[in-house]
Amino acid sequence: MKIGIDCRIYGPKHTGIGRYVQNLVENLLIQDKENEYVLFINKDSENDFENLKLKIKNSFQISNCKFQIVFTDVSHYSLQEQLLLPKLIKKQKVDLMHFPHFNAPVFYGGKYVVTIHDLIKHLSKGPSTTTRCTALYWLKYLGYKIVFKQAVKRAEKIITPSQYVKDELIKLYKVGADKVIVTYEGVDNKFQANTKYKILNTKYKIKNPFLLYVGSVYPHKNIERLIEAVKLIDKKLVIVCARNVFRDRLNNFIAQNSAEDLVTFTGYVSNDELARLYQEAEAFVFPTLSEGFGLPGLEAMSLGCPVICSDISVLKEVYKNAAVYFNPLDSKDVAEKIKLVISDKEILEKLKKQGLELVKEYSWQKMAQETLKIYKEAA
C-alpha cells in the first residue's frame, strides 16, 4: 500500500501537533517494512527531514524503509491548500492519505484518515480569541467550520488523542463511535537534558527557584490566572512559548498587574534546553481551559517535574492521580495548590514517583502501531 502523510506541520517548532507528526513518521518507518510512504513537506521543514534521513542512514532499524519526500510549499489554511494540494497528492497515486490535522482539503477525492486533536476552536471562539479584525476572523471561522465538517464526514477513519475528544466529536457531529479511534500520544524516551543549567541562566536570565509553563499563550490557555497566582505567592514563572501570537496582549496584562519582575519569556527553546528547564523547575503549572491531550504535562513527568494543572476532564483522563488539580477560573485556588505542592516534600516526591510511573503507559511506538492498524482498516 502507498500511504501519503501531510507533514507540513513537522517537528517541535510546530508545538504539539509537530511533535505528533514527527514521532508518528519516525516510528512508522521503524515498524513498517511492507508499505511505501509519501511525505508531503514544506521547505521550512527541510532541515528536520535532513535529520530524519541521517537517522535512517545510521539506523539498522529503519534502513529498509520505503519512503519519498515531496516538497509542497503550500501554506496551511490557505486557498492553495484547498486547490493545489489535492493535485499534488493525486499525482503521487497514493492508496490512502493521512491528514494529521483537521484541514483535509475539501476538494481531495481520495480515501483518507484524519486526526482531530481537539475541538478548541468550537469552544473558544469570538473576537477575544483573535488578533485579527472581527470581519476577517468570522470569515476564517466560517472556513474552519466548513473544512472541519467535511473532514469529519468524508474521512474513512478519525483518530483522536483522547476519549474526551472522541466523546465531544460524537456529541457535536453525530459520528458513529466505530469511526472514531483513540490513539494516545507518547513521550520520547530520548527526551533528556544535555544542556547545562548555567547556559540557560546566561541565555535566558533564569534563576532558581521558578515555576514553568510550556505552550502557546492563546486565550484558552488561561495564562492570566497563572500570572495572578504567581503574583499572590511572589513566585517566578518561566513561560516557554515559541509563538508571539497574543504576546502583546499578555505583556499588557503583566504590566497592569506589576508582574514584570516575576515573568520570563524564553521564546523557542531546543529539546535539550526544554528538558533541562523541566528538570530545574519546582513544578510545571498548566492552567488551560481546554485541551485535546496535554503532552507538556507528560513531558514534565518523564523528567521528574511535578505537575499542577486544571481540573478539566481530559487532563484527569490522561494524568490520572499523577497531578494535583485546581479550579482554573480561580487564581487563589491556583496559588494555594502551587504553594501546597512546592512547600511539602512528601507531596513533591509522591508526584514525581507517580508521574514517572504514569508515563510508562504512553508510548509513541504503541501509537504508531495503532495508527498502522487504522490505515489497514481504512484502505
Explain the meaning of each model-derived region.
Residues 1-379:
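Carbohydrate transferase catalytic cores enriched for Leloir-type hexosyltransferases
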